[in-house]
Structures are given as C-alpha cells and as structure tokens.
Regions:
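Flexible, small-/acidic-enriched active-site or ligand-binding loops
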Residues: 153, 206-237
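Hydrophobic, small-residue-rich alpha-helical packing segments that form membrane-like cores
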Residues: 146-150, 165
Length: 352
C-alpha cells in the first residue's frame, strides 16, 4: 500500500470516527479492512473472470473472525450488534464485492434470521458451524416467475406426513445456493391461506430430494455463487420448522428492514472503493502536461461523487442505527420500514 492509499484510508477512518464508533468498533473495522485487503482483494480478479468461488473461503473467513458477528461469543461469534455487522459488510464489500454479497446472505439472511426466530435447539445445532464457516448458509424465498408478490404467489409446498414434512417446489436466484449446507426455506403449509399459510424451515442440503438445478451466470457480483434449488419429495423432520406453522410471514418481516439496511452497507463499500480508484486515476492520468485532477471539470465530478457517497453513508448508518435492538414484530411497517427502503434506494442509485 503506497502513501497515497494510506492517506485515503486515514481520511475514511476519520469519517467513520465522526459517527461516534466505539473503540471496539474501530478496532473491528481496522482488522476487517486489513484482512479483506490482504486476503479477499487478491481473489477478486479471478473470481470475476472465471465466476469462481474458492472452496475453503468460508472456513477461512471464519478463522479470520468475519463470520457470526451478531452471534454469542460462546457459540463462536463476536457478540456484536447489527450496526457493527454492517460495518464489517461495508469493508468486505469494498475490497471484494462478491464476497460481500455472499457474506451478507450467510451472516444476515441465514444466521441472523436463525438467531432471531430459531428454537434453542436449532440455534445450538447450526449457529456454531455458521460462525466457524464449517456450514455455509443461504435463504430460499424467491421462486421462478415471482414478482413483487413473492409471498402470495409462492408455489413451493410442505405437507405434513407424520413427524415429517415433505417439500416440493423450487427457488431461484439464491445467493450461496450452489454451495450452501443449510437453507432457511419458505414453503406453503396451507395453500388455502395464501401468504398467511407460509412456514419457515431450516433445510440441510444433504437431504434426499434436494438438488441444485443450475448455477446461474451473472453480469455482476461474479464469483458469488447463485443458483436454482429444487425440492422433490424432500423429507425433513417437523423439528426443522422455524417458528410456528403458518407463521413464515412473521419470520420474513422480522428481518426485512435489517436486510434492506444491510444492502446499503454493500453499496457504500463498493462506492467508496470506486471513488478511491477514481481519485487515484485522476492523479496519475495526464493531459496537456498535467494530471487531469487539476482540471476543474474533473474536480467537480469527483466532488459530486464524494457527496453522493457520504450522503449514502449517512443515510445507511441512520437506517442501521434504527434497526439495532428493534423488538421482534416491530419491523415490516411504519417509520422503520420507510426509512430502510429509502436508504436502500438512495445507496443503490448512488453506487450506480
């Protein structure tokens, strides 16, 4: 890392300090920044070119302390809050966006939901492995042909058969799907009730009847494995149900606002890196005998980008702070719902 990079990093650390991060949070950010720059960033070019995911990467992330940020320390986690988890996501995404995306699906969509809604037995069974990286997590909600009515139009079913449920259906665009060991899955247990007849299950992917139908080829976030999952008479024990029967919507909504807010951290991290690269290029690219950074038009454009990045960061941090300690059942409506949706919209558009 050259002195120019060091100066940029110091400036960004100062910006984060102004958001009143604790000393522990600053230490975590510094650690994640270092290991992401040294370990994850060198993988990015090959991951993008070959749509490649290193087989042992989740275990390596577990060893580096990048997983289970919100999980209890006695289960191998870090015992931090959701805001700190978002800081980790932001920094990882800055240095390797594909890893940032897969990290979010694992640590937030799967692990956080399990911590929030799982039984004591389910948490003890799966969370330690998710923290160590011995297990890779995913979430299965979206289905082929589903639009904004993903819950009401859900076709995947789970029918009771004695002490088991038998699952049939498919899920599409599932981040980590091709490599997942456990999937938090939503399926209809009572088709007559529409969205109110959905239940959540934690599915082990070595179950007979489960298969990855295809790994999808994407334009962006290449390397992060995304796939179609198929369940064909997939039998799971009733103990795999997360929450009560037909309460899947409450499981979905319990994490929706946090999930939206977490997306903003991915956008902010990527936008921050894009700004850094733009600044570096403007300083070394010369026209008419001087760096283009000295031209007022270029300076103006960079100033606009900087303003958008920092506005997105402020919006992101505000939304994330509002999600910390949100009581179960308080999400999915009202001010928090509006705030996280707006933050997600702004951060995504600012990054683009």
């Amino acid at each position: 890392m050259n002195s120019q990079d060091s100066t940029v990093m110091a400036d960004l650390q100062a910006i984060r300090a102004n958001y009143s991060l604790t000393s522990e949070q600053r230490q975590i950010v510094d650690h994640v920044d270092r290991v992401s720059r040294e370990v994850l960033h060198p993988l990015q070019a090959r991951m993008d070119a070959e749509d490649w995911w290193p087989d042992d990467l989740f275990k390596q992330m577990g060893e580096l302390g990048l997983l289970g940020i919100t999980a209890p320390e006695e289960m191998g986690g870090s015992g931090q809050n959701e805001f700190t988890q978002a800081l980790v996501s932001e920094v990882i995404s800055k240095w390797n966006p594909a890893v940032g995306l897969s990290h979010g699906a694992h640590d937030n969509l799967c692990l956080n939901n399990l911590l929030r809604n799982g039984s004591e037995e389910q948490v003890k069974k799966y969370v330690p492995g998710l923290c160590s990286g011995d297990l890779v997590g995913a979430l299965g909600l979206t289905e082929p042909g589903a639009g904004s009515d993903a819950l009401g139009s859900m076709a995947t079913t789970a029918r009771r058969d004695g002490d088991d449920y038998i699952i049939n259906g498919s899920k599409i665009y599932i981040t980590n799907g091709p490599i997942a060991d456990v999937v938090l899955l939503y399926a209809k247990t009572d088709k007559s009730k529409g969205a109110k007849g959905i239940s959540a299950f934690i599915i082990e992917t070595d179950n007979p009847g489960f298969k990855v139908a295809q790994k999808l080829d994407k334009m962006g976030f290449r390397g992060s494995p995304t796939g179609e999952l198929v369940f064909d008479e997939c039998r799971v024990p009733a103990s795999a149900m997360v929450g009560a029967e037909n309460s899947g919507v409450s499981v979905v909504m319990s994490g929706l606002d946090l999930e939206r807010a977490m997306v903003t951290s991915v956008c902010v991290g990527m936008a921050e890196r894009a700004l850094e690269l733009g600044l570096e290029y403007a300083k070394i690219r010369e026209q008419f005998g001087k760096p283009i950074a000295s031209f007022q038009m270029v300076q103006s454009k960079l100033a606009e980008i900087y303003t958008e990045v920092e506005t997105a960061r402020a919006f992101s941090y505000r939304a994330l702070a509002a999600c910390v300690g949100l009581p179960k059942g308080a999400g999915g409506r009202g001010e928090i719902h509006k705030l996280t949706a707006a933050a997600c919209l702004y951060a995504g558009e600012a990054f683009n």
